[in-house]
């Protein structure tokens, strides 16, 4: 059996398909009736007669949309799926690169070495890699000549926590961004009881034990 389609058969198939398309384009649209058996010309495409009715799904007309129904309505409601982090609450920081007055947080810039200027299509990638390394090195403590001795006092107040509940406190968060050839870092504090999100957000205390400000974020608001 020959599995190849001849050139004249290809032309007939194309012509048949064009006739079917022109028929549906020229026929008036009458809701679900436009796909009934009566709307298809006999002999044009017999295989299309049974398929449309199997796939036909009735939808409410436009006149029912937006109307209020009494009791349990059978209309279709649109479902809006919120972002995955919407349930976490908090106030999203619209522009974490520039701290607003009274908002809290510090913006610092990791300057690049002027002698290192990569070129080519991977310039931004190389500069970002350099900025990331310098950003990480900022938080690496230098070697100490002597071992520090911490004096423990029972009942003493821990940093960033209330004396009645040492579990409450703040955690420091950072957001790195690449802006105009330099790496900018925005850092701020959030209560430790708040969730950690991918987007930069300010959260409020949920447990009631976290202070409004801690030793780390006092400098975020400037001088008192």
Swiss-Prot record:
Residues 54-98, 145-172 are annotated as: Disordered. Residues 151-172 have a biased composition (Basic and acidic residues). InterPro entries: Paramyx_V_Zn-bd. The keyword Ribosomal protein does not apply. One of its GO terms (molecular function) is metal ion binding. GO terms for biological process: symbiont-mediated suppression of host cytoplasmic pattern recognition receptor signaling pathway via inhibition of MDA-5 activity; symbiont-mediated suppression of host JAK-STAT cascade via inhibition of STAT1 activity; symbiont-mediated suppression of host JAK-STAT cascade via inhibition of STAT2 activity; symbiont-mediated suppression of host type I interferon-mediated signaling pathway. It is found in: Virion; Host cytoplasm. Keywords: Host cytoplasm, Host-virus interaction, Inhibition of host innate immune response by virus, Inhibition of host interferon signaling pathway by virus, Inhibition of host MDA5 by virus, Inhibition of host RLR pathway by virus, Inhibition of host STAT1 by virus, Inhibition of host STAT2 by virus, Interferon antiviral system evasion, Metal-binding, Viral immunoevasion, Virion, Zinc. GO terms for cellular component: host cell cytoplasm. Coiled coil: none annotated. Residues 54-65 have a biased composition (Polar residues). Zn(2+) 2 binds at residues 193, 205, 207, 210. Zn(2+) 1 binds at residues 170, 189, 214, 217. Interacts with host IFIH1/MDA5 and DHX58/LGP2. Forms with host DDB1, CUL4A, STAT1, STAT2 and STAT3 the mumps virus V-dependent complex (VDC). Plays an essential role in the inhibition of host immune response. Prevents the establishment of cellular antiviral state by blocking interferon-alpha/beta (IFN-alpha/beta) production and signaling pathway. Interacts with host IFIH1/MDA5 and DHX58/LGP2 to inhibit the transduction pathway involved in the activation of IFN-beta promoter, thus protecting the virus against cell antiviral state. Blocks the type I and II interferon signaling pathways by interacting with host STAT1, STAT2 and STAT3, and mediating their ubiquitination and subsequent proteasomal degradation. Belongs to the paramyxoviruses V protein family. This is Non-structural protein V. It comes from Mumps virus (strain SBL-1) (MuV). The gene is P/V/I.
